[in-house]
């Protein structure tokens, strides 16, 4: 990727959600949501190839596909549930990632070549104030966050170097740790800043909040980590500078590289991202389109799907979600 100046992949993936035995209700109205890639930033050419309910192709009136640039993009099935019936969608997309050297050595010599990138998630100029604002209850500039951001950034004025200092702090001080459901944490960022531990999403939110507190626009990006070996849930962040537009920060991957003594990998995940990503959420805690009628199992992210009957939503242990890699090919960056 470094030698080529970037990398690209074309994916074809099938997502399937099934209702487990104790939650099956034959003949009842059901809504089922599965994540889809958002067509923005690094993702292009999203195509839906198949939508199936049970053993048949779904009718057009039985599902709704959210707009391509939705904050959290899904396909929503709305139909009658039958016992044993599963819900699946097969889609393809392209992910292209440009490589830039944001290592300490490069930054000390002025950083990589500047680029002109003024457009955001929808291909139009974004209101940068939105990416600098607080978003209670989790993205808040508490006294702890303000003081921590000030201590980390110090007298540095360059936005790129400020973001690198924040990334360095998180990747060298915050240990990766599984956490209980985000729904049970009253202030995720405060939890991370005080305990110095957290999973990929906790670390991404801490990075976003510290960046915003330091005057650097930053936002959420999350979905699936899609490699030839596995498809799993993952969260990361983006930050903006006038000189380089929107770039990436994967603090959990960067922190793992740092702890293993892999300086090249540590440097890579500041400003860069591998192409094995399916971004299905570009904001944290936003409603689906169309929204659910009841409380989501995961009200913040969009990774493992959701389901609800008319009277209630289904808990995590009442349904299962599977992803299958149909094909993965390298494409010219």
Residues of each region from the PLM?
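Hydrophobic/aromatic-rich core segments of domains that either
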Residues: 202-292
């Amino acid at each position: 990727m470094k030698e080529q100046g970037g990398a690209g992949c074309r994916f074809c993936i099938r997502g399937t959600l099934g209702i487990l035995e104790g939650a099956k209700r034959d003949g009842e109205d059901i809504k089922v949501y599965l994540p889809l890639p958002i067509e923005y930033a690094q993702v292009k050419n999203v195509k839906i190839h198949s939508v199936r309910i049970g053993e048949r192709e779904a009718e057009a009136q039985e599902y709704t596909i959210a707009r391509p640039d939705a904050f959290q993009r899904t396909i929503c099935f709305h139909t009658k549930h039958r016992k044993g019936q599963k819900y699946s969608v097969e889609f393809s997309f392209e992910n292209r990632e440009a490589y830039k050297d944001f290592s300490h050595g490069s930054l000390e010599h002025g950083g990589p070549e500047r680029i002109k990138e003024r457009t955001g998630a929808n291909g139009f100029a974004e209101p940068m104030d939105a990416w600098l604002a607080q978003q209670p209850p989790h993205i808040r500039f508490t006294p702890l966050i303000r003081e921590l951001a000030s201590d980390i950034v110090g007298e540095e004025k360059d936005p790129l170097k400020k973001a690198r200092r924040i990334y360095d702090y998180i990747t060298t001080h915050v240990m990766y740790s599984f956490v209980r459901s985000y729904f049970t944490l009253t202030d995720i960022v405060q939890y991370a800043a005080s305990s110095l531990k957290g999973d990929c999403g906790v670390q991404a939110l801490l990075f976003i909040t510290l960046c915003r507190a330091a005057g650097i626009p930053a936002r959420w990006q999350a979905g699936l980590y899609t490699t030839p070996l596995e498809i799993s849930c993952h969260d990361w962040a983006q930050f903006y500078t006038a000189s380089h537009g929107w770039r990436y920060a994967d603090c959990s991957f960067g922190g793992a590289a740092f702890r293993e003594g892999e300086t090249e990998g540590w440097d890579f995940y500041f400003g860069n991202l591998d192409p094995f990503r399916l971004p299905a959420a570009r904001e944290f805690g936003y409603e689906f389109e169309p929204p659910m009628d009841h409380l989501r199992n995961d009200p913040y992210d969009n990774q493992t799907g959701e389901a609800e009957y008319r009277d209630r939503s289904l808990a995590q242990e009442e349904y299962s979600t599977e992803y299958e890699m149909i094909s993965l090919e390298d494409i010219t960056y």
